[in-house]
Structure formats: C-alpha cells, structure tokens
UniProtKB/Swiss-Prot annotation:
Catalytic activity line of the entry: 1-(5-phospho-beta-D-ribosyl)-ATP + H2O = 1-(5-phospho-beta-D-ribosyl)-5'-AMP + diphosphate + H(+)
Pathway assignment: Amino-acid biosynthesis; L-histidine biosynthesis; L-histidine from 5-phospho-alpha-D-ribose 1-diphosphate: step 2/9
Gene from which the chain derives: hisE
Lineage top rank: taxon: Archaea
Species annotation: Saccharolobus islandicus (strain L.S.2.15 / Lassen #1)
One Gene Ontology term, aspect cellular component: cytoplasm
Subcellular location: Cytoplasm
Swiss-Prot/TrEMBL GO biological process terms: L-histidine biosynthetic process
One Pfam short name: PRA-PH
Predominant localisation class: cytoplasm
HAMAP family: HisE
Entries under CDD domains matching the protein: NTP-PPase_HisIE_like (cd11534)
Protein name: Phosphoribosyl-ATP pyrophosphatase
SUPFAM superfamilies: all-alpha NTP pyrophosphatases
Length: 94
C-alpha cells in the first residue's frame, strides 16, 4: 500500500468542500466550521486511544481511519496538503 489512497481521499475532500453536495458528510461537517472539524479530530483521537487500550485491533483500525479522515478535512481547511506532511515526515527522518 502507498500514499495513493490518502492522496485520492484528500482530492475527494477538496471537491466536497468546493461543491458542498447535499448528503455529503464532508460538506456537512465543513458547513459547521473549522472549530467543529477540529473538535471532531479531538473526539476521534480519544476514540483511537480507547480502542488501543481495549486491545481490539479491528476497532483500532476503524478509529485510526476515522482520525485520518477528519485530519485530512482539517488539513484541507488549513490549506495543508498530504505532500506538506510527507515532506515534514521525510525531513524528520534524516
């Protein structure tokens, strides 16, 4: 697996933010504002921690996916791309 799925998801998120289609969860949370999206990131972080402590791998994977999705939405609202994060991670690796 590569970064491809993250990049594809980010592009879908950008499209949903731009077009705000009815029935889109992304559009729904973005319409509530950046503070709401940031709170969702916090909630998903806690849920990820709880799933980890419960030692339930399937639940943990699901919560990590939710956290990544909400982080990508917040990143889009901040104008930060996955490439920005990849570069920062690469910089830290050195």
């Amino acid at each position: 697996m590569s970064n491809e799925i993250v990049d594809k998801l980010y592009k879908v998120i950008l499209d949903r933010i731009e077009k705000r289609p009815t029935g889109s969860y992304t559009a729904e949370i973005v319409n509530k504002g950046k503070a709401y999206v940031a709170r969702k990131v916090g909630e998903e972080s806690v849920e990820t921690i709880v799933a980890s402590l419960a030692e339930n791998k399937e639940r943990f994977i699901s919560e990590v996916a939710d956290l990544i999705y909400h982080l990508l939405v917040l990143m889009a609202l901040e104008g930060v791309t996955p490439d920005d994060i990849y570069r920062e991670l690469e910089r830290r690796r050195k």
